[in-house]
């Protein structure tokens, strides 16, 4: 087979052959195989060229994908599949990228966890789930998580939540709110409970009463649209009790309110 035409098309070159076959190759392919018009290729040379062209093209795609941020092996492989790179070529590209240290799942997991320690608010369970979703194996994640102390981060998150809700909730409800939020963010129950120890939940009676008055007004506006009489009183009691207010305080308020 003879090359009848070589034409540059943006980042690739169009190669046309005298058997009406054509293919796109990278500049690296042109250089490696010393391709030029009228060059004759046998079948083995053509197959080698096609393999190298896709390998070169796929690797360039992968490097472009990696230029934005670190990626896992799986993320790179999935990206190449979307661009219709063949599976055996993808395997070769991943191997090359690993050898050249462009991708490293262990380093990616370590960086992700360290960044969370500095700027994030996620506990180990959520972090592991997110890393698994990136295609990183548990054996690359677990050792890093086990060596990471999440106690200071849990305290930082609990302090932020405390500052946000302390003027809106009574002590019991505030503790429950913070604990549940930490659990949702992936911290263990023990770590969530321990993080509460550095917070001051003391509120004087007047502060609690003011919060109760405010919450009672809010719930009354909401529930009085649907209920009245004894049913309204029951609904108000239940709503306030769920918010963490003392039963005797609620009953006292309701007697004077309704």
Swiss-Prot record:
Enumerate the InterPro entries for this protein: RecX_HTH_1st, RecX_HTH_2nd, RecX_HTH_3rd, Regulatory_RecX, WH-like_DNA-bd_sf
Classification via Pfam families:
RecX_HTH1, RecX_HTH2, RecX_HTH3
User: Where does this chain mainly localize?
Assistant: cytoplasm
Entry's Gene Ontology BP terms: regulation of DNA repair
Q: Which Gene3D superfamilies match?
A: Winged helix-like DNA-binding domain superfamily/Winged helix DNA-binding domain
* Protein's cellular compartments: Cytoplasm
GO CC list: cytoplasm
Write out the coiled-coil annotation as residue ranges.
none
Alphabetized, the UniProt keywords read: Cytoplasm
HAMAP family in the cross-refs: RecX
Would you identify the family this protein belongs to, as annotated?
Belongs to the RecX family.
- What the protein does? Modulates RecA activity.
The entry's protein name is Regulatory protein RecX
Q: What species does this protein belong to? A: Streptococcus pyogenes serotype M3 (strain ATCC BAA-595 / MGAS315)
């Amino acid at each position: 087979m003879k090359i009848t035409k070589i034409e540059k098309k943006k980042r690739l070159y169009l190669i046309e052959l005298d058997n009406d076959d054509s293919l796109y190759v990278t500049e690296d392919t042109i250089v490696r195989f010393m391709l030029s018009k009228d060059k004759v290729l046998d079948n083995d040379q053509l197959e080698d060229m096609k393999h190298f062209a896709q390998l070169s093209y796929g690797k360039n795609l992968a490097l472009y994908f990696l230029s934005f941020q670190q990626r896992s092996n799986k993320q790179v492989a999935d990206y190449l599949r979307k661009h219709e790179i063949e599976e055996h070529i993808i395997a070769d590209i991943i191997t090359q990228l690993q050898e050249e240290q462009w991708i490293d799942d262990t380093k990616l997991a370590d960086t992700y966890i360290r960044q969370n320690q500095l700027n994030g608010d996620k506990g180990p369970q959520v972090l592991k789930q997110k890393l698994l979703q990136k295609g990183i194996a548990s054996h690359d994640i677990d050792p890093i998580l086990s060596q990471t102390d999440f106690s200071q981060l849990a305290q930082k998150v609990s302090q932020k939540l405390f500052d946000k809700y302390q003027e809106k909730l009574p002590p019991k409800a505030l503790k429950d709110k913070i604990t549940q939020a930490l659990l949702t963010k992936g911290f263990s129950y023990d770590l969530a409970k321990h993080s509460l120890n550095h917070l001051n939940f003391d509120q004087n009676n007047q502060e609690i009463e003011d919060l109760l008055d405010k919450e009672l007004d809010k719930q009354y506006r909401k529930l009085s649209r649907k209920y009245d009489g004894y049913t309204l009183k029951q609904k108000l009691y239940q709503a306030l009790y769920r918010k963490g207010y003392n039963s005797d305080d609620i009953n006292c308020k309701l007697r004077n309110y309704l």
